[in-house]
A protein has these predicted regions:
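Bacterial N-terminal signal peptides
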Residues: 7-17
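Sec/Tat signal peptide C-region and signal peptidase I cleavage site
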Residues: 17-23
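Extracytoplasmic "Venus flytrap"
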Residues: 27-44, 64-68
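Short, polar/charged alpha-helical segment
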Residues: 35-60, 124
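Contiguous mixed-secondary-structure segments that line small-molecule binding/active-site clefts
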Residues: 46-47, 83, 88-158
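A local structural motif
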Residues: 48-66, 134-135, 157-158
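Alpha-to-beta junction loops
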Residues: 54-57, 73-87
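Short helix-initiation/N-cap motifs at beta->coil->alpha
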Residues: 62-75, 154
Length: 159
């Protein structure tokens, strides 16, 4: 009887140690396709996490809305359906109007301006996300508002 008790203690210890030794895998929901620079940054972030954690945490990216569509990512992470997600912040304005601050026309017209705006708004954004049970990890600037064309536009006539 003592032997069985001893054996069960060893088995429980083994099971517990196996669970702590197993690397953890997180699925990261991404709205944009793999070729988009936001997805490329998320993939690099995931790679860095795996390397820096010594493989204890692996983040698998799911670009193009393959895990959750863009509009579903915020809720999916909040409810634990996805461990991590990346989303264009201003698309979350219904969750918190402050998240739209960087998309106000002409407020930040360059990457330098975007960095200043980010630094000025980050603390409140972090606080707002924290109140929703989320952790702000990083930000990637989106190109400033502009006119996109296949040909160069130098005058009104070019339009």
């Amino acid at each position: 009887m003592k032997f069985l008790k001893y054996l069960s203690t060893i088995l429980v210890s083994l099971i517990l140690s196996i669970n702590t030794a197993i690397a953890e895998k997180w699925d990261m929901a991404l709205a944009y396709g793999a070729g988009n620079f936001h997805s490329a940054n998320a993939t690099e972030f995931a790679k860095n996490v795996t390397e820096k954690s010594g493989g204890k945490l692996t983040i698998v990216t799911h670009p193009g809305g393959s895990l959750f569509k863009g509009g579903e990512i915020f809720r999916a992470v909040r409810t634990g359906q996805a461990q991590i997600g990346e989303r264009f912040m201003s698309a979350l304005g219904k969750e918190d109007p402050l998240l739209e601050v960087d998309s106000q026309p002409f407020l930040a017209t360059s990457y330098s301006d975007a960095m200043k705006l980010y630094k000025a708004s980050k603390a409140e954004i972090v606080k707002g996300l924290d109140e929703k049970g989320l952790v702000f990890l990083y930000a990637v600037p989106w190109p400033a508002q502009g006119l996109y064309s296949k040909k160069q536009i130098n005058s009104v006539e070019d339009l």
